[in-house]
Each structure stands twice: as structure tokens, then as C-alpha cells.
């Protein structure tokens, strides 16, 4: 049943307007990051690493939470129309399978987004910043860490989009979560807030490794928040029928 749900969710992406956002926002982020790097060459002297900090700063803080929030809101949009929610609750599909299917599809979109962001990073580094060689192998590692941290953001936004009928409100809350994550990370408590995990994983706006000596805690926090949001989704779907 889960496989069928995933196939059904994937069909929603065919000719979807979210693909325009998929391309536009990473390009905007890369443009801003490259411009900021080129304007501060006297300060940003660490080559590929310095360019990475500029590319990932606003991507991890604003653009990615907004994109994930939009993905999640779009996938729940059909269920919130008319009486579709009642039909879903009366169907033989386990409600948590529906949530898990949307989670899998947003992960796929996040993976594609991360890949596109990294391709833009390499392109801008070679073409505009004239970087020598290829990016250090640690930068793709940061990208993978960011994807692990993004799982909590994805689950959080799916829960918000599930319980809030408005399309715009979950997106605003995603942006707010990302901005809040910056301040919480600055205070040294980033592992305690789900929206900080992706920023820490990406090592955004930092020259030193933000997770040095904390990989275990980072993985535990990512898993813990993921479990929390899945349990919350299960309880809401089971007890409240999430009336929108």
C-alpha cells in the first residue's frame, strides 16, 4: 500500500508549478552567494570553502526551508480540498502510509534540490570565481550531512501542512523556523532545534567544521526529531482525523 501511495504522490509532480521554484530559488541563492563572495575577496580567502559559506548561508537559512514548506503544502493541497479529507479517512489506506509516502517524495525532491545546488556551486566556482581544481571532498560530505539534517525539517513541514489548511501559513512558519535556527545555532544550541540541523550539517557560513566531535549527537538529534514528528503525525491522524 505504501508503494501505491508513493506512486500516487509522484503523479502530483507531473507538470507541477513547483518545478519553476525548484530551478529559480537555487539559482537566486547561487547568484547572491557568488556575488557576495566576489565582493569580499579580501576577507574570504579560503577558496572553495569560502565560496561554500556564501552559497549555503541563505540557502540553508531561507531558501531550503521555504522550498520544503512549499513541497509539503503542495502535496497536502489535494487532501484539503472539499471533502477529500473525509474520503481519505474512510479509505482502506493506513493514514500513516499517506504521510510516509509524502515524506519519501519530499526527500526525493530535497535530494534533487541538493544536487542542483551543488552543481551550481561548482559551475559558479569555475566560471565566475575561477577556482583551481575541483571542490574538496569534504564539501560533498557537508552536502550529505545537510540532507540528513533536512529530514527533520521535511517531517516538521509535512506535519504543519497536514494540520493547517492554508497554503501560505506553513511556508511562513518554515521561513520563521529557518531564521530562528540561525539564532539558536549562534547560541550553541543548534542540535536542539530541528531547523538548525540542516544548517549545521551544511556547515553554512562557517570556516571550521561545525560538527567536529559531535557527529554522534548530530545523528541522534536528526533521528530523534524524525521520530517525534512521525509519532505526532500518527497521533494526529489516529485521534483527531486532522480536520482542516
Q: PLM features: residue spans?
A:
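Terminal transmembrane helical anchor/hairpin motif
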Residues: 35-52, 171-244
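Secretory targeting signals
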Residues: 26-68, 100-164, 205, 213-219
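Membrane-helix interface segments
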Residues: 17-18, 82, 94-96, 100, ...
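Aromatic- and glycine-rich beta-strand/loop motifs that create alpha-glucan
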Residues: 1-26
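Helix-loop-helix units of permease transmembrane domains in multi-pass membrane transporters
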Residues: 75-107
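Pore- or pathway-lining transmembrane helices of multi-pass membrane proteins that form conduits
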Residues: 21-26, 164-182
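Cytoplasmic juxtamembrane interface segments
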Residues: 1-7, 76-89, 147-170
Amino acid at each position: 500500500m505504501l508503494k501505491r501511495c508513493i506512486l500516487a504522490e509522484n503523479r502530483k509532480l507531473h507538470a507541477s508549478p513547483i518545478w519553476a521554484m525548484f530551478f529559480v530559488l537555487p539559482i537566486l541563492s547561487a547568484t547572491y552567494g557568488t556575488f557576495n563572495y566576489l565582493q569580499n575577496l579580501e576577507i574570504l580567502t579560503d577558496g572553495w570553502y569560502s565560496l561554500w559559506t556564501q552559497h549555503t548561508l541563505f540557502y540553508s537559512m531561507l531558501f531550503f526551508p521555504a522550498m520544503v514548506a512549499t513541497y509539503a503544502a503542495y502535496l497536502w493541497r489535494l487532501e484539503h480540498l472539499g471533502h477529500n479529507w473525509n474520503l481519505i479517512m474512510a479509505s482502506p489506506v493506513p493514514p500513516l502510509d499517506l504521510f510516509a509516502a509524502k515524506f519519501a517524495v519530499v526527500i526525493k525532491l530535497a535530494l534533487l534540490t541538493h544536487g542542483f545546488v551543488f552543481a551550481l556551486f561548482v559551475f559558479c566556482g569555475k566560471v565566475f570565481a575561477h577556482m583551481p581544481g575541483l571542490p574538496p571532498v569534504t564539501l560533498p560530505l557537508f552536502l550529505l550531512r545537510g540532507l540528513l539534517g533536512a529530514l527533520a525539517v521535511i517531517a516538521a513541514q509535512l506535519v504543519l501542512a497536514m494540520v493547517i489548511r492554508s497554503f501560505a501559513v506553513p511556508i511562513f512558519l518554515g521561513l520563521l523556523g529557518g531564521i530562528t535556527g540561525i539564532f539558536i545555532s549562534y547560541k550553541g544550541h543548534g542540535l536542539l532545534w530541528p531547523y538548525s540541523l540542516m544548517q549545521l550539517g551544511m556547515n553554512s557560513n562557517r570556516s571550521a567544521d561545525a560538527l567536529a566531535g559531535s557527529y554522534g549527537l548530530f545523528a541522534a538529534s536528526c533521528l530523534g526529531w524524525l521520530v517525534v514528528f512521525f509519532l505526532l503525525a500518527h497521533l494526529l491522524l489516529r485521534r483527531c482525523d486532522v480536520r482542516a
